[in-house]
């Protein structure tokens, strides 16, 4: 089966919005062993849409078309498909009734323009969208089934999961069995990871892939076929052995997700005092439901005054060592932990840039501490100074990893290949 995708919308083509829909579709299908082989983005121009449908349908078996199903004048997908096939639009009575019922149930007055969403190409097969008003549909043109999906991400994901995947499974048969392991790493560059893992002789049917999303690089170990699937655990073990402490999570989308899972399951509590990370450590945990069960509080103590008055940092420490120092973050971590007697506390203080650095403490210098009921662990690292966001996100990742390792009762301070650490 040859799978392609046509993404529509002037705002996507011009870069006004990032096309996360296409990335999600490709990744979701890839994890099922279904590879996207071609993708094109087309603006809101009728001739271009018609040409894209006609041309790509000669090469693909199935095409996901995303966007352009709404009620406004720039939503052209249904009409463009009808023109591409040389047929009329006809009203789908079932969907018109769905629209009328949807607006009634939600106590809203339906603008007449919404009825446009019920007009589909004459040969179209309606695809249900129970979570929205844009009607999905599929049409056969030349060699391909074109499967039209809404641009709203929540609606798209629902339709792909509930409608598209079952359709292609039935239409094209079950794909070869596949399995996937994902390892999240920090402290390595992508090329460094590839060089390190080149030592492994991969069995037939197993492939390695890399996805950089700083501060993490995700390694995907993909196995296709029964024999490769049986060999997958051994290959995963080899990868982890070679990378050592660089692997910080398995089959989790982010390190924050790993920390949330471990804290939620453990019953331990956490408090956070942040300076250079500015609430990032706390915010990423709050994204997860249930974080209130372990997160006591997160404080952004950016100024020296707040470090002293809120956290109880001795002013002499700041005078002697400065805000970006191991003694300061240790005092911050101990102070915030003591407020509510939390099991763990994290603290950060650093120079995110672009200004503020010195010869002794250049931009990218960050001090991080973890306080427990048994002691304090701390380190000061030198991070890449490409942007404030990168310094903050990498600081957050290192802080999370210190906590993760403490929860696992492993060494809290470890060496990362590409992150130098200052001597204490």
Swiss-Prot record:
SUPFAM superfamilies to which the protein is assigned, alphabetical: CinA-like, Molybdenum cofactor biosynthesis proteins
One short Pfam name that applies is CinA
Which CDD domains does the record cross-reference, listed alphabetically? cinA
Superkingdom is: Bacteria
- Family membership noted in the UniProt record: Belongs to the CinA family.
Q: What is this protein called?
A: CinA-like protein
């Amino acid at each position: 089966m040859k799978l392609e995708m046509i993404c529509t919308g002037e705002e996507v083509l011009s870069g006004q919005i990032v096309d996360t829909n296409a990335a999600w579709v490709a990744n979701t299908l890839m994890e099922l062993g279904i590879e996207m082989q071609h993708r094109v983005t087309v603006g809101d121009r009728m001739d271009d849409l018609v040409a894209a449908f006609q041309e790509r349908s000669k090469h693909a078996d199935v095409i996901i078309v995303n966007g352009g199903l709404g009620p406004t004048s720039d939503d052209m997908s249904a009409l463009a498909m009808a023109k591409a096939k040389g047929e009329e639009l006809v009203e789908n009575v079932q969907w018109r009734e769905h629209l009328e019922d949807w607006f009634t149930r939600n106590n809203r007055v339906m603008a007449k323009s919404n009825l446009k969403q019920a007009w589909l190409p004459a040969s179209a097969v309606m695809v249900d969208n129970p979570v929205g008003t844009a009607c999905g549909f599929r049409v056969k043109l030349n060699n391909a089934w074109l499967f039209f999906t809404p641009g709203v991400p929540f609606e798209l994901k629902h339709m792909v999961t509930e409608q598209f995947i079952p359709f292609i499974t039935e239409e094209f048969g079950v794909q070869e069995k596949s399995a996937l392991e994902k390892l999240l790493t920090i402290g390595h560059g992508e090329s460094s990871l590839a060089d390190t893992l080149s030592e492994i002789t991969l069995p037939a049917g197993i492939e390695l892939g890399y996805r950089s999303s700083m501060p993490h690089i995700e390694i995907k170990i993909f196995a296709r076929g029964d024999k490769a699937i049986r060999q997958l655990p051994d290959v995963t073990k080899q990868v982890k052995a070679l990378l050592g402490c660089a692997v910080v999570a398995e089959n989790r989308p982010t390190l924050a997700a790993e920390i949330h899972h471990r804290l939620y399951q453990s019953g331990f509590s956490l408090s956070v005092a942040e300076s250079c990370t500015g609430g990032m450590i706390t915010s990423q945990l709050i994204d997860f439901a249930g974080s209130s069960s372990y997160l006591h509080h997160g404080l952004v103590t950016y100024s020296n005054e707040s470090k002293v008055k809120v956290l109880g940092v001795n002013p002499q420490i700041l005078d002697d060592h400065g805000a970006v120092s191991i003694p300061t973050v240790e005092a911050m971590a101990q102070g915030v932990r003591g407020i509510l007697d939390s099991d763990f506390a994290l603290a950060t203080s650093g120079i995110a840039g672009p200004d503020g650095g010195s010869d002794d403490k250049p931009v990218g210098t960050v001090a991080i501490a973890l306080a427990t009921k048994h002691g304090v662990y701390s380190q000061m690292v030198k991070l890449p100074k490409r942007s404030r966001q990168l310094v903050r996100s990498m600081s957050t990742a290192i802080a999370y990893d210190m906590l993760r390792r403490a929860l696992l009762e492993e060494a809290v301070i470890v060496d990362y290949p590409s992150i130098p650490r200052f001597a204490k």
